[in-house]
Structures are given as C-alpha cells and as structure tokens.
C-alpha cells in the first residue's frame, strides 16, 4: 500500500517545482522546506554505480567539511601514555584504555566517533558486534586508526564526516543544518562530492553517480542533476 504523507509534507512537495535541480539551486530550495521545530539536518543521498562485494569498489572514507556539520561531536580515544595526553590536549571528550574498553563492554556508547592508536586495535576486535552496527569501529580509511591522534581529534571536532556505501551502493550523509545559509550547504556538498568523485574505482562500469538528492530530516527530497555532479573534481 502506498505511504500516505501528511498534509504538511504534501504542502512541502508543492514547493519542489522542478524534476531536477543543480546543486546551488538545491541548496537554496532545501532551506525553503524547513518545517520542524528543531534544526533539521541537511542530508545528501547518493546512489553509486559500484558493487561493494568487490573490495576495490567498497567506497569508504572520510572528509572534513569546510563549514562542519553543525553538530557537536563527542570524541572518544582509545590510547595510553603520551598518545592519551595528546588526545586530551586536542580536545577529546573521553580518553583512556581500560576506561574506554569498559564503556564499550557495558554498551555505553556515549560518543559519536571512536579513535584508536594501531596498538589498541587488537583489544577492540572482540567488540566488533557492538561497534560495527553503529559505524563506530575505528578504521584506517576514515583516519580513526592513527598515531596522529591529535589531528584525528581536531578533524572530528571540525566536522569530519565518515562515509561508506551500503551493499546496494547507497550512501546517506549529514552535511549541515537547516540553519546554515545556502552557500555553506552548497560548499559542504561540493567538498563531499569532490571526495566521492576522486574515489571512483577504475573497475566501476557505467555511470558512477546514478542518483542524488538533498533533503532535510523531515522534508521531501530535492533531486539533483547527476550530470553536473560528475563535474566536481
């Protein structure tokens, strides 16, 4: 049965007066779709022409958005000694070895990003089922397994977005807030799409960005012109 949308949603749909928008227009249009009482997240959805079952087509990484995400990010760092001190100085919220491991074991995942030094990864293996589904397992591809914990903490606090395609090639990321001006939404989107385009696998066949849309948490989607998106390099 078709999903019945609310009257509010139907009114918002009327504001989307074109089938596709270029990115700049879409950044302006999503601001017109604000309807919730809270500061909605601006979400970018992409469908990529990749098959993540092939290791070389698993698109995964991170990018620091020029204007951040608008979200206060809580960072935990699994490290000891001098590296723990560096993480604290850089502004990490939770730092340590036993303390952090105990939190994870108890299912107390009161953080948005977990960073670990390489020597700590052996201790995290048994927590794969806890951290994996939440996207919290540190990974070198997202810069969260590193000896440079200070820079990783700064990146996380500055608005680093970690991303990966699902098994069907879809990807959803928050790139800002409805309260951002349209130019900031646009520039964040450009930074993200440039990163995705740079990661196009040589083995991917056909169109790389197949579908793309911008939306707010509670709004309909504004469809993007995928031909334009391929030009951001």
UniProtKB/Swiss-Prot annotation:
InterPro entries: Ribosom_uL1_bac-type, Ribosomal_uL1, Ribosomal_uL1-like, Ribosomal_uL1/biogenesis, Ribosomal_uL1_3-a/b-sand. Keywords: Repressor, Ribonucleoprotein, Ribosomal protein, RNA-binding, rRNA-binding, Translation regulation, tRNA-binding. GO terms for cellular component: cytosolic large ribosomal subunit. Coiled coil: none annotated. One of its GO terms (molecular function) is tRNA binding. CDD domains: Ribosomal_L1. GO terms for biological process: regulation of translation; translation. Part of the 50S ribosomal subunit. Binds directly to 23S rRNA. The L1 stalk is quite mobile in the ribosome, and is involved in E site tRNA release. Belongs to the universal ribosomal protein uL1 family. This is Large ribosomal subunit protein uL1. The gene is rplA.
